[in-house]
Regions:
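Ankyrin repeat (ANK) tandem alpha-helical domains that serve as protein-protein interaction scaffolds
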Residues: 1-231
Length: 231
């Protein structure tokens, strides 16, 4: 085991050692690390759940590893329904991030089950679905009463999801100057152009500066040319 050799050579370890072992599903490594005094924290359970390693999660929890809402959120983000169900049945808490992480991962079935089981959500569910480009998830969330705010448009602009931004605006999602700023900083000129043509407010100086700093010169040039001609 490489970890044994590293420890024999005096290499330090910390909570992250157990977390990484859990993420990789390396139960024997995790067991050896714990038997030899390696610390752990909540991220061991979160990482195991996120990558679907139920046996690792079960061993960790049985042996006293702390867990928090991140365990359910991690399982939801990874779309690991069996892990999520086990975690809930064994006392793991959840919160709004559980729905948000499911939406961000595009896991429609998981999100539906969460809501049917009473898991709370908030505006982050919509913004994370938007960031991931998951239009169907966003549409279902809105149809089911999930709130949204300006972060939904900002997230679509940040990731360049023009079709999703168009749908959000057509359905009343608010936006602010951060929509243009995020489009500019990530080089999504088509998103920026559409947003401005449809009345999105902006700080053109900020957009131009960010684009220049990132070497996105086509965006910077367009902003400079259109700073006056567009409202």
């Amino acid at each position: 085991m490489e970890l044994k050799a590293l420890r024999a050579d005096g290499w330090p370890w910390d909570d992250g050692t157990c977390a990484v072992a859990a993420r990789g599903g390396h139960l024997e490594v995790l067991q050896w690390a714990r038997a030899n005094g390696c610390p752990w924290d909540e991220f061991t359970c979160t990482f195991a759940a996120n990558d679907g390693h139920l046996e690792v999660l079960q061993w960790a929890r049985t042996n006293g590893c702390p867990g928090d809402e991140g365990t359910c959120a991690g399982a939801a983000e990874g779309g690991n329904l069996k892990v999520l169900q086990w975690a809930r049945a064994n006392g793991c808490l959840w919160d709004e991030f559980t729905c948000s992480w499911a939406a961000g991962g595009g896991h429609f079935e998981v999100l539906q089950l969460l809501r049917a089981s009473g898991c709370p959500w908030d505006e982050k569910t919509c913004s994370w679905a938007a960031r991931g480009g998951h239009l169907e998830v966003l549409q279902w969330a809105r149809a089911s009463g999930c709130p949204w705010d300006e972060d939904t448009c900002m997230s679509t602009a940040f990731c360049g999801h023009l079709e999703l931004l168009q749908w959000a605006r057509a359905n009343g999602c608010p936006w602010d100057v951060m929509t243009c700023a995020r489009a500019a900083c990530c080089g999504h000129l088509d998103v920026l152009q559409w947003a401005r043509a449809n009345g999105c407010p902006w700080d053109w100086r900020k957009c131009e500066s960010i684009a220049k700093d990132r070497g996105i010169f086509d965006v910077a040039a367009w902003v400079h040319e259109n700073k006056i001609t567009l409202p």
